[in-house]
Amino acid sequence: MSDPLPSSFEDNPQFEEETGLQKFRRRLKEEPLIPLGCAATCYALYRAYRSMKAGDSVEMNRMFRARIYAQAFTLVAVVAGGMYFKTERQQRREFEKAVEERKSQEKRDAWLRELEIRDQEDRGWRERHAAMEAAANEAAKKAAVKPTAEQDAARSVIEAADQKSLGVLDAVMELMSRQK
C-alpha cells in the first residue's frame, strides 16, 4: 500500500522520529526569535511590576509600552518564521504521514502473520483430530468385521436362547454340544 520513502528523506538525518525534547530544541534552533520575544515580554512585565511596587508610574508605563513592542516583535517573528519554514514543515508533515503509514502497515502485517499462524495451528489440530477419528473408526470396523469363533458361537446361542425362550441350563447344554 505505501511506497518506500523517497530518497530525499533517507539521506537527511533531520527527518527522523524525534522525542519531545529534540523537537523543542529543533524548533528553538529554527526560530530563535520567538523565544527571544517571549523572554523580552516577560522581562518587560517583570520590570513593570517592580516599578509599580516602587511607585514609579513613568517607568511602569514605559515598561508596559516595551511589553507591547516585545509582543509585536514575537508576533512578527511567528508570522515570518511560518512563511520562511513553510516548505520544510510541509515536507515534515509528509514524512510523518509516511512514517505513520509504515507503522500501520507493519502492525497490519504482524496481525496477518499472527492470523496465518493461528489458522495453520487450527488446520493442524483439525487434521490430527480427523486422523484420530479415522483411526478410531477403522479400528471399530476391524473389530466389527472379524468376530472370533467363540464370539460367534456365544452370540448364536444367546440369540437362539432369546428366540426359544430357553433357560440357562438349556443354553449351556446347547453350547457344549456345539463345541464337541
From Swiss-Prot:
Q: Name one Pfam family in it.
A: HIG_1_N
Where is it chiefly localized? Answer: mitochondrion
Q: Which GO terms describe its biological process?
A: mitochondrial respirasome assembly
Presence of keyword Oxidoreductase:
no
**Looking at the record's lineage, which domain of life comes first?**
Eukaryota
Leader peptide range in chain numbering: none
As recorded in UniProt, coiled-coil segments are 88-108
Q: Which PROSITE patterns does the UniProt record give?
A: HIG1 (PS51503)
Keyword Glycoprotein found: no
Where does the chain cross the membrane?
Answer: 32-48, 68-85
Please give an example of a GO cellular component term from this record.
mitochondrial membrane
| Record's bilayer topology term | Multi-pass membrane protein
Listed A to Z, the keywords are: Coiled coil, Membrane, Mitochondrion, Transmembrane, Transmembrane helix
Q: Where, per UniProt, does this protein localize?
A: Mitochondrion membrane
Please list the residue ranges annotated as the HIG1 domain: 5-96
Q: What does this protein do?
A: Cytochrome c oxidase subunit which plays a role in assembly of respiratory supercomplexes.
Per the record, the similarity remark reads:
Belongs to the RCF1 family.
Quaternary structure, from the entry:
Associates with the respiratory chain complex III/complex IV supercomplex.
Protein name listed in UniProt: Respiratory supercomplex factor 1, mitochondrial
- Gene this protein is translated from: rcf1
